[in-house]
From Swiss-Prot:
Lineage: Eukaryota, Metazoa, Chordata, Craniata, Vertebrata
Name assigned to this protein: Cardiotrophin-2
Name of the coding gene: CTF2
Superkingdom to which the source organism belongs: Eukaryota
InterPro entries linked: 4_helix_cytokine-like_core, PRF/CT
Cellular compartments annotated: Secreted
Amino acid sequence: MSCSLARLCLLTLLSPPLSSAASISPAEPISQAYSLALYMQKNTSALLRTYLQYQGSPLSDPGFSAPELQLSSLPPATAFFKTWHALDDGEWLSLAQRAFLALTQHLQLVEDDQSDLNPGSPILLAQLGAARLRAQGLLGNMAAITTALGLPIPPEEDTLGLAAFGASAFERKCRGYVVTREYGHWTDRAVRDLALLKAKYSA
């Protein structure tokens, strides 16, 4: 074997393999995620409205709103403009993936709660199940975007822990209100941020 050929073989062996993510354009998964988020956005108000309708007073009272109610296990979608504007793509994707992972788990919990509290409400249960599946789908799209950009995917975690159990009927109703409300808020935020990503990485 000649010296030059031996050198070429050695360089080939030492060269790191090309990342599969490097050959994937982020434009396609971003477009898919954006389309799904837009579709989800069309249904979030109906989900919240249907949910409140089945909970009884005061939640079902006209004009009910309780923005002060929050869940420590579910990150709020609101953020100061300066903080949001300073996020890079990786930071936003990480926050969004953690939020929609938490939402899928919380929506399953709310679905279980409503099966117990309102077993005769197939429309509500169907809407909750559909919202959970769409949140899972958007989470998968965001993972594909993250991979295409060569960024690490946040690890899955149990966001509910022990806090999900032992709540009263009214506490479970309020918890479901917060979850369905924040599902809408996070979907609105996803639409806005994915639109920016779509413009940035358009083919």
